[in-house]
Amino acid sequence: MSTIAESARIHPMAVVEDGAVIGEGVKIGPFCHVGPHVVLHENVELLSHAVVAGRTVIGKGTRIFPMAVIGGDPQSVHHGGEETTLSVGANCTMREGVTMNTGTADFGGQTIVGDNNLFLANSHVAHDCKVGNHVIMSNNVMLAGHVVIEDRVILGGGSAVHQFTRVGRQAFVGGLSAVSYDVIPYGMLNGNPGLLSGLNVVGMTRAGVDRAVIHRVRRAYKSIFEGTGSVRENAAAIRDEYADCEQAVQILDFIAADSDRALSSPTRGQKG
């Protein structure tokens, strides 16, 4: 039997299956479908024809627009019907036609989306992805399985991210770009194949990063990608010099971390 809060408003032409948990202030419009294992926290709003399926939890204040399908089975040949999950944080917006899939059992079974994210029309979050907070995915952005998107990333319209790829904090990916390799924090990537084109200085400035700090991060970037060694060797060589610069350290830590993918770079042949 469903648990439906007294203040929830459910249109008589919506379907809420037995077992669903509907929180206070939730609004469910006509022709919506809410599955039996779904939890909608307070003040979630489903506009007409939205679908929330699977073992999915939607955080408070999130809005889901028409024709979005949230919590569908993973699009993976390895999925055997296991009970995997999708967790979406608070105050997200999923515009028309957005799709998000649950995880796969072989990789922990969880797709996780953070808070305050904006997913524009027809964008897709595949199985086992991890999306941070304050992320913007523009129209028709596609995340393949196991992708990690860190906080405050902006992905331009029609861009596609290869499976297992990481996109670092506050990076900016231009429209129609193909992201085949990891993108450093604060990096800007454009094109197909995607290449770094410098730092997201506009984003850093908007975030209140001091101009002198931005100048230091630019110097670090130049040392990393224009030094005589590999990218990882160059990054390790400057760690002590930039130990007091938070943004530079984030870049250096990202480069040093284990990853299934190589690093995006400013030139096609350089991969870390």
Curated annotation (Swiss-Prot):
Its EC number is 2.3.1.129. GO terms for molecular function: acyl-[acyl-carrier-protein]-UDP-N-acetylglucosamine O-acyltransferase activity. GO terms for biological process: lipid A biosynthetic process. GO terms for cellular component: cytoplasm; membrane. The keyword Signal does not apply. Pathway: Glycolipid biosynthesis; lipid IV(A) biosynthesis; lipid IV(A) from (3R)-3-hydroxytetradecanoyl-[acyl-carrier-protein] and UDP-N-acetyl-alpha-D-glucosamine: step 1/6. It holds the Pfam family Acetyltransf_11. It catalyses: a (3R)-hydroxyacyl-[ACP] + UDP-N-acetyl-alpha-D-glucosamine = a UDP-3-O-[(3R)-3-hydroxyacyl]-N-acetyl-alpha-D-glucosamine + holo-[ACP]. The keyword Lipid metabolism applies. HAMAP family: LpxA. PANTHER family: ACYL-[ACYL-CARRIER-PROTEIN]--UDP-N-ACETYLGLUCOSAMINE O-ACYLTRANSFERASE (PTHR43480), ACYL-[ACYL-CARRIER-PROTEIN]--UDP-N-ACETYLGLUCOSAMINE O-ACYLTRANSFERASE, MITOCHONDRIAL-RELATED (PTHR43480:SF1). Homotrimer. Involved in the biosynthesis of lipid A, a phosphorylated glycolipid that anchors the lipopolysaccharide to the outer membrane of the cell. This is Acyl-[acyl-carrier-protein]--UDP-N-acetylglucosamine O-acyltransferase. The gene is lpxA.
